Swiss-Prot record:
Monomer. Binds 30S ribosomal subunits, but not 50S ribosomal subunits or 70S ribosomes. Keywords: Cytoplasm, Ribosome biogenesis. PANTHER family: RIBOSOME-BINDING FACTOR A, CHLOROPLASTIC-RELATED (PTHR33515:SF1). Its main location: cytoplasm. This is Ribosome-binding factor A. GO terms for cellular component: cytosol. Gene3D superfamilies: 3.30.300.20. GO terms for molecular function: ribosomal small subunit binding. One of its GO terms (biological process) is maturation of SSU-rRNA. Pfam families: RBFA. It is found in: Cytoplasm. One of several proteins that assist in the late maturation steps of the functional core of the 30S ribosomal subunit. Associates with free 30S ribosomal subunits (but not with 30S subunits that are part of 70S ribosomes or polysomes). Required for efficient processing of 16S rRNA. May interact with the 5'-terminal helix region of 16S rRNA. Belongs to the RbfA family. It comes from Nitrobacter hamburgensis (strain DSM 10229 / NCIMB 13809 / X14).
């Protein structure tokens, strides 16, 4: 009977990936909150880090960020990309891994998606479908 060592793509991240991702998330959130990055764009924004995803080999961290208020997202992502080398070094000092993960930043769009769904649920057509029928008795 053949054994399959590769993970099924639907099974999600391993416990180690999740643990390392959470450690990296805390480290990058602390770095940004304490103002260690001297960049005028970043100094003018409070940045939340809701999620970090690690690659299977733990060599790539995709960091999802959102400026508080959701404004200037592209400017913030560009500033973080510009300071990527410094941030990677800070993460390496704070997280005990064999290799410092390469990092990339992405905008967290879950808030926008939740708002879109909320608006959709408030449309008259959906409200009509959700209303209890008064004809049923």
């Amino acid at each position: 009977m053949p054994r399959h060592n590769k993970k099924d793509s639907t099974s999600g991240a391993s416990q180690r990936q999740l643990r390392v991702a959470e450690t990296v998330r805390h480290a990058i959130a602390d770095i940004l909150a304490q103002g260690h990055v001297h960049d005028p764009v970043l100094e003018g924004h409070l940045i939340t880090v809701p999620e970090v995803r690690m690659s299977a080999d733990l060599k790539l961290a995709t960091i999802y960020v959102m400026p508080l208020g959701g404004r200037d997202t592209t400017d913030v992502i560009d500033a973080l990309d510009h300071n990527r080398k410094f941030l990677r070094g800070e993460i390496a000092r704070r997280v005990n891994l064999k290799f410092a993960p390469d990092i990339r930043f992405r905008a967290d769009e879950r808030f926008d998606e939740a708002e879109r769904i909320e608006k959709l649920l408030r449309t008259p057509a959906v409200q009509r479908d959700l209303a209890p029928d008064s004809d049923e008795s």
